Amino acid sequence: MKAAGAFRWTVAATVLAAMLASALSFRADAQSEYMRGDRMPYDAFDRLPRTDIEVPGGTIHVAFAPGDITLPKEKLLDWIRMSARAVTTYYGRFPVASLRLLLVPVDGGRIRGGTTWGYRGAAIRIPLGRDSTEDVLQRDWVMVHEMVHTALPDMPDRHAWLSEGLAVYVEPVARVQAGDLNAREIWQAMMRDMPKGLPQAGDQGLDNTPTWGRKYWGGAMFCLLADIDIRKATNNRLGLQDAMRGVLAAGGSHEQDWPIARILATADKAVGVDVLTRLHNEMGPKPVTPDLAALWRDLGLKRMGEDIEFDDSAPLAAIRKAITAPHVQ
């Protein structure tokens, strides 16, 4: 009896292990179908059940790859709505009429980046840690970052700094305008992280230096300088936000392929000054090192240990406030 009982337990354990291995294998295979390579799995996405979220100017079609996620589906949809609201606040409408949004459950408790495509229609894929909490979603920047990509035409890789830099710059500004962040947080982050975008030894300008720092923070620095210069030239009536709305109004979403010159010329036309084209002529082919310390001082930003203070008497304090203020039509 003992031998038979032991045998039955062994068989049961073997069967259970096989079932577990099969389930894990199925989950891995399912994930690989949606995470394989650097292309959006459009066909696989279109076979999944979808939930549609209506936003001003468009519809977000949300699909979940197979796998467990701890949070209820509605909490995830709320996160998407919150992110879309921030992007809509910045651009005046959602950038594309139709967006496929694929969430792929992965191990862990955080959002593991994202990717945006436009070659068969606007699409975003987000690997989402299955144990992510509501707090993680509330503080997330990735979803807004990826949605901002949908508002800019696709460009050759050498100009990826504009796409990534714009997303780095616009994401927190949009979230402040939507009431999801406070201005102190984003200026503190800019003061901390913007130096990562400064030219290093051997730099050959934004167009020719595809390092991580230059692509992301060098591009964000370009956007900040452009925003300030547009506002200086228009008596603070218009800014980069108006310029990029102009690109979108001209049909320049991520579903289009435009050369950078067309993007910048369209943006300049929208605000009536050639700031973006001029800045690109300066910073694209050769390294330019702005005096960030002087810039922060002029914007009225003072570092106080780990915190910052605002000096509203500074020369560019009004511009600093206008950048994060809700846009007035």
Where do the language-model regions lie?
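Bacterial N-terminal signal peptides that target proteins for export
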Residues: 2-14
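Bacterial N-terminal signal peptides
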Residues: 11-23
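Boundary at the C-terminal end of the N-terminal hydrophobic targeting segment
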Residues: 23-32
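Long, contiguous juxta-domain segments that are non-catalytic but functionally important
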Residues: 31-46
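Beta/coil-rich, acidic/histidine-enriched accessory regions frequently appended to metallopeptidases
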Residues: 32, 253-329
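Juxtacatalytic substrate-recognition/specificity segment
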Residues: 49-155, 159
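Soluble non-cytosolic domains of exported or imported proteins
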Residues: 70-82, 133-138, 142, 157, ...
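Acidic/His/Gly-enriched intrinsically disordered linker/tail segments
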Residues: 157-227, 233-234, 240, 244, ...
